[in-house]
Amino acid sequence: MVERERTFVMVKPDGVQRGLVGEIISRFERRGLKIVGMKMLEVSEELAKQHYAEHAAKPFFPGLVSFIRSGPTVAMVIEGKDAVSMVRSMLGKTKPIESAPGTIRGDFALDMGRNVIHASDSPESAKREISLYFKTSEIATYARIDEQWLYE
């Protein structure tokens, strides 16, 4: 049995407004990752401040909070082997100009402040961020029909 890890992913307002949600979900699913939780929401100021708490003292914090609240977002819990590192590699670098073609940011993002997507940077961050956005009852447990072909 393969040990599966969960990570938190959010399509930011720019990704939602540009109609990229379906393409992004498809990339994760085609890679063999499983979406076990998903919701569209408008992030409250309180939730935005909790989510980005580690940046509270930084000069860009107010803009970060303002942007994440500027429109609807799509929050997801994604599960799979090494999900945190797998998803991070699929996203590309935070600065889109440094992101390789074929990554989500390399293909769709132009500006660091509007970089389409957020994902947890560690298993600890994933647990914290998942708990901010999802109740345990909102996360599904199921097996993909192709799991026997994905993992040894």
From Swiss-Prot:
Keywords: ATP-binding, Cytoplasm, Kinase, Magnesium, Metal-binding, Nucleotide metabolism, Nucleotide-binding, Phosphoprotein, Transferase. Its main location: cytoplasm. It catalyses: a 2'-deoxyribonucleoside 5'-diphosphate + ATP = a 2'-deoxyribonucleoside 5'-triphosphate + ADP; a ribonucleoside 5'-diphosphate + ATP = a ribonucleoside 5'-triphosphate + ADP. The keyword Phosphoprotein applies. GO terms for biological process: CTP biosynthetic process; GTP biosynthetic process; UTP biosynthetic process. The active site is at H118. GO terms for molecular function: ATP binding; metal ion binding; nucleoside diphosphate kinase activity. One of its GO terms (cellular component) is cytoplasm. Its EC number is 2.7.4.6. It is found in: Cytoplasm. Signal peptide: none annotated. Major role in the synthesis of nucleoside triphosphates other than ATP. The ATP gamma phosphate is transferred to the NDP beta phosphate via a ping-pong mechanism, using a phosphorylated active-site intermediate. Belongs to the NDK family. HAMAP family: NDP_kinase. PANTHER family: NUCLEOSIDE DIPHOSPHATE KINASE (PTHR11349). This is Nucleoside diphosphate kinase.
